[in-house]
């Protein structure tokens, strides 16, 4: 499962993360994955791939998945990539708390993502927030 914006989850535990850094028209992509052992994370449950697959088998799987998604991103409407992300994300309606970079905390229900990847958060009173940066708690 994917947790916005960049966490990779396995059975509700953080397995890894995806980082993107843009410079001009180029983007560097980094993947961090707990292959052999789950680290101790304060306030967060972590997972590793060791019980799911052999660590040496992971690189070809990652390379193939990344190549497919990169092709989708380059050759199609960005909304198709957003839809592909949603099929692997926490379900619409999941209760979330977002801690923004401005030390603001907002809570509501996951309402999808925008075409540019921003999080849609529906507050309890019905208003919709579009979140472009922050840390999400499930």
Regions found by a protein language model. Give the residues of each.
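Long, positively charged amphipathic alpha-helical accessory segments at protein N-termini or as interdomain linkers
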Residues: 10-138
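Alpha/beta catalytic cores of group-transfer enzymes, especially the acyltransferase/condensing modules
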Residues: 2-6
């Amino acid at each position: 499962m994917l947790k916005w914006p960049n966490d990779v989850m396995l059975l509700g535990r953080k397995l890894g993360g995806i980082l993107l850094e843009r410079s001009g028209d180029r983007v560097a992509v980094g993947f961090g994955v707990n292959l052999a052992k789950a680290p101790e994370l304060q306030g967060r449950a972590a997972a590793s791939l060791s019980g799911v697959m052999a660590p040496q088998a992971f690189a070809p799987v990652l390379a193939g998945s990344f190549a497919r998604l990169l092709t989708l991103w380059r050759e199609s409407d960005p909304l198709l990539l957003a839809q592909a992300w949603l099929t692997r994300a926490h379900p619409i309606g999941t209760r979330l708390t977002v801690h923004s970079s401005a030390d603001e905390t907002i809570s509501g229900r996951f309402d999808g993502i925008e075409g540019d990847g921003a999080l849609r958060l529906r507050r309890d009173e019905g208003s919709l927030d579009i979140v472009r940066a922050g840390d999400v708690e499930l």
